[in-house]
Amino acid sequence: MDKIFITGLPLSTVIGTYPEERDLQQKIILDLEIDIDLAAASVSDDLIDTINYAEIEEKMIKLAEESHFYLIEAFAGKAADIVLSYEKTTGCTVTITKPNASHRATVKVVLRREK
C-alpha cells in the first residue's frame, strides 16, 4: 500500500484533564500516515488522483483551534475520522505527541484506523 506522511505539524489546542489545562492552549504535535493508492497520481501528475495534503493540514489546524478535548486519544480519533472521510484513503495512523504531558515525560498516542 502506498502512503502519504504528514509529520511534525505543531498545533495549539485546549486539551487535558486537569482544571489548569482547561483554560489554556497547549502544544501538541501531529503525525499522519495515510494509506492511499497512488498509482494513478504517480502517472498522471494530477492532484485529482490523490489527496490535497495542504487541505488536510488546514483541517487539522481547524480541529485544534475549535476543539476542547480532555484526552489526546479523542483528538487522535477525530483526526482519523477526518482523514478517512476522503474517498481515496483506505486507512491511517495518527500519532499525537504532547510535550510536558506529565511533570517528567512527553506522552505519545498512536491510533490506527481503517475503512
Roles of regions detected by a PLM:
Residues M1-K115:
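N-terminal, polar/charged subdomain of small-to-medium soluble alpha/beta proteins
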